[in-house]
C-alpha cells in the first residue's frame, strides 16, 4: 500500500527545500503506522483497487471536482460499486466519470466562502485534518504548487487514494498522520489550513502554535472553526456533547479567536467569513446514511442544538506568521 502514497515523488518535489529532511523520514514513519493497521483497512483498500484503471482525459478542479471520459454505463457501474465500498463519504461532492458522490457535507459551499480570501497560486500548502482530500484537489484547482494533507483516518486516506488513482501526476499527497506526528519547527509551508479541527482540540492554543511551527516566516494561516456570539472574553465549553459530538471542547467568539491568534504570535488576524451551517449544507445522503445535522438540532428551534446550545456557526480567519 505504501507505494501508492507516492512518497518518492514527494521527496523529489521537496528536494532542495527546508522540508526535504522531513520527507526522507516519512517512509519509515508511515510504514510503522500501516503496520499498526486498522480492522477495516484491508476492506477499504480492496475497494480502491476495484476501481477500473482508466484514463481521465478531462479533469475539473477549479469550479468543482469532476473526472470526465467517454466510457459507458458498465464502467460507471463498476466505479459506483467500488466507491460505495468506501461509505460513508463525509466531504465532497465528487463526480467520478458521471458517478455523483453526494457527500454529507457540501464542502464546495465552504470552499466558495473561503477561497476568495486566500491567494494560493504557486504556494506550497499544508492541509491539517484534510479528511478525504476534497479541499486538497480544490486548492490545486486554485493554483497551489503542491498540497500535503495530514489526517490519521484510514478511511479518509482510502477515499483520497480513490481520486489519486486517476490523478497520479498531480502534486497532492495524503499522509496518515496527525499534526502531532510532524516535527517541531518544520517551517516549510507558505500556507497552512486548519478547517474543522480546532474545536476538537483540548488545548487550542497549542494547536495554533503547532500550526505556526509549520509555516515559513511570512506564511499564512487559514483557520476555520465553530464560533459563538460574544466579545473577547466569550468562550463556550460544552458540559458534555455539542450537536451530539462528544469531542468538542472550545467554541470561542470571533473576538476571542483573534485574541488567541495574537497570543500564539500571529499578526494581521482578520475574520473573512461567518456563516450558520444549514441543514442543506450538512445532511444524510445515499453516500452517508448516518444521522446528520437535521437530527442534531432542536426540532422545535433550529437555532439550538438538541442539547440547547447555539446551533453551529462557523468562522474563517486568516492570519500571518511574522
From Swiss-Prot:
Enzyme superclass (EC): transferase
Any one GO molecular function term: transferase activity, transferring alkyl or aryl (other than methyl) groups
Coiled coil, from the record: none
Entry keyword set: Transferase, tRNA processing
InterPro entries: CmoB, Mo5U34_MeTrfas-like, SAM-dependent_MTases_sf
CDD domains: AdoMet_MTases
Residues involved in carboxy-S-adenosyl-L-methionine binding: 91, 105, 110, 129, 179-180, 195, 199, 314
EC nos: 2.5.1.-
Reactions performed catalytically: carboxy-S-adenosyl-L-methionine + 5-hydroxyuridine(34) in tRNA = 5-carboxymethoxyuridine(34) in tRNA + S-adenosyl-L-homocysteine + H(+)
Subunit structure comment from the entry: Homotetramer.
Sequence similarity: Belongs to the class I-like SAM-binding methyltransferase superfamily. CmoB family.
Role of this protein: Catalyzes carboxymethyl transfer from carboxy-S-adenosyl-L-methionine (Cx-SAM) to 5-hydroxyuridine (ho5U) to form 5-carboxymethoxyuridine (cmo5U) at position 34 in tRNAs.
Protein name, entry field: tRNA U34 carboxymethyltransferase
Gene name, Swiss-Prot/TrEMBL: cmoB
Amino acid at each position: 500500500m505504501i507505494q501508492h502514497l507516492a512518497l518518492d515523488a514527494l521527496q523529489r518535489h521537496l528536494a532542495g527545500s527546508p522540508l526535504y529532511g522531513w520527507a526522507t523520514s516519512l517512509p519509515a514513519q508511515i510504514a510503522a503506522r500501516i503496520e499498526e493497521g486498522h480492522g477495516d483497512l484491508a476492506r477499504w483498500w480492496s475497494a480502491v483497487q476495484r476501481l477500473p484503471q482508466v484514463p481521465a482525459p478531462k479533469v475539473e478542479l477549479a469550479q468543482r471536482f469532476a473526472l470526465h471520459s467517454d466510457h459507458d454505463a458498465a464502467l460507471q457501474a463498476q466505479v459506483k460499486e467500488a466507491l460505495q465500498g468506501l461509505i460513508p463519504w463525509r466531504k465532497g461532492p465528487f463526480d467520478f466519470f458521471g458517478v455523483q458522490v453526494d457527500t454529507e457535507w457540501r464542502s464546495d459551499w465552504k470552499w466558495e466562502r473561503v477561497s476568495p480570501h486566500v491567494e494560493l497560486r504557486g504556494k506550497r500548502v499544508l492541509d491539517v485534518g484534510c479528511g478525504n482530500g476534497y479541499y486538497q484537489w480544490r486548492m490545486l484547482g486554485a493554483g497551489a504548487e503542491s498540497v500535503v494533507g495530514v489526517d490519521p483516518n484510514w478511511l479518509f486516506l482510502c477515499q483520497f487514494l480513490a481520486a489519486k488513482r486517476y490523478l497520479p501526476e498531480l502534486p497532492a499527497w495524503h499522509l496518515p498522520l496527525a499534526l502531532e506526528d510532524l516535527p517541531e519547527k518544520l517551517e516549510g509551508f507558505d500556507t497552512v489550513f486548519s478547517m474543522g479541527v480546532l474545536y476538537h482540540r483540548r488545548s487550542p492554543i497549542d494547536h495554533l502554535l503547532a500550526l505556526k511551527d509549520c509555516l515559513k516566516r511570512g506564511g499564512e494561516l487559514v483557520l476555520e472553526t465553530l464560533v459563538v456570539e460574544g466579545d473577547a472574553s466569550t468562550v463556550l465549553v460544552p458540559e458534555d456533547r455539542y450537536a451530539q459530538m462528544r469531542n468538542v471542547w472550545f467554541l470561542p467568539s470571533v473576538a476571542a479567536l483573534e485574541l488567541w491568534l495574537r497570543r500564539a504570535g500571529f499578526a494581521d488576524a482578520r475574520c473573512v467569513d461567518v456563516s450558520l451551517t444549514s441543514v442543506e449544507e450538512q445532511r444524510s445522503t445515499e453516500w452517508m446514511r448516518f444521522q446528520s445535522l437535521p437530527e442534531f438540532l432542536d426540532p422545535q428551534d433550529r437555532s439550538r442544538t438538541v442539547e440547547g446550545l447555539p446551533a453551529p456557526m462557523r468562522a474563517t480567519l486568516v492570519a500571518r506568521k511574522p
